[in-house]
C-alpha cells in the first residue's frame, strides 16, 4: 500500500509538471531559450511573509476557543552562473506561534533549511550535479498535558539535524521543471542530546547518530500558472539500500500555491506530506500515551497576510567556453 502511494504521487506530479499541450509548444521553446540565455553572474532574491490569524468569540452558542496565531516565513536564494557552471543556494526559515484561550503561547511551526547545489552543463538539458542539504529547527519543542503544562522536550536546535547529499544528474528541460537523480546518496540524522535521542522520535532509532546510503530522486516544479497565481512543488524520494521492500521509500512532498493580491498582500496554501518508516509517532487514548506507530504525516497551512518579494541581478561578462 505504501509503495502504491509513492508511485501514485510520482505519477501525478509528473502529469501536472511535465505535460505540455500542443498549443503550448511554442511557449515551451521560449522557456528553453530563456533558460540557456540567462546571463552570467549572481541572481539574488527572496520572499518574506507575515501571516496573522485571530478568532474572537463572545456568547457563541456553537462553542469554540478564541485564539491568536502568527506565522513568519522567509525564502531566499543566491544563484551564480559562470559559463557552463551553475551554483544554486537556498535558505528557508519558518516560525509560527499560537495562543489558545488562557494557555501560554506555544510554537506551532519551526523550520530552518539550507540547500546548496553545483551543476556543470554536459548538454542543453542535462547537468552533472552534486548537492548538500541541512534541515533542523530553531527553538525547543515541548509536549503538553491536558492542562497545558509542559511535560518533556522532544526537539531543539540541531536536535535533530538532518544532513543529506548526493552526486548525480540533473535534468532541466525548461525554467520551470527539474529532476535530479542519483544512485549514490547519503542521509545523516544527528540527535546529540541523549534525552531527546532516547525518545526515538526522529528516525535515529534511539541513537545519537544514524547514517544511510541509498538512492534519491528530487522533482521540482515552479511556475506562475495564471496571472498572480504561483505553484511550487518539491517531491523528494529516498531509498536506503539496507532497507527491504517492506520499509519502502522515504517521501517528503511540499506544495505551495500563492496568490498575489497586490505588492504587499498575499494569500497562500501550503501542504507538507512525509512518510518515513523510521519515524515513530506517539499514539494517545483519552490523553494518555499508549505507544508509538508508523503513520503518514501531513501538515497544511492556509493564510492571508503581508508579503514582500525582492530580486537583484549582478551580471558578469565572461568568454564563452568551447
PLM regions: where:
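Outer-membrane pore/translocation modules
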Residues: 106-214, 291
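Outer-membrane beta-barrel "beta-signal"
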Residues: 296-322
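Repeated loop/turn-to-beta-strand initiation elements of outer-membrane beta-barrel proteins
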Residues: 85-87, 125-128, 176-179, 228-231, ...
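Residues that define the transmembrane beta-barrel architecture of outer-membrane proteins
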Residues: 66-72, 108-112, 159-163, 209-215, ...
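Extracellular loop and loop/strand-boundary signature of outer-membrane beta-barrel proteins
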Residues: 58-64, 99-104, 149-155, 202-207, ...
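Residues on the lipid-exposed face of transmembrane beta-strands in outer-membrane beta-barrel proteins
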Residues: 46, 50-52, 72-80, 114-120, ...
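Transmembrane beta-strands of outer-membrane beta-barrel pores
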Residues: 50-56, 82-84, 93-99, 134-140, ...
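Sec-dependent signal peptide cleavage junction
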Residues: 16-47, 313-322
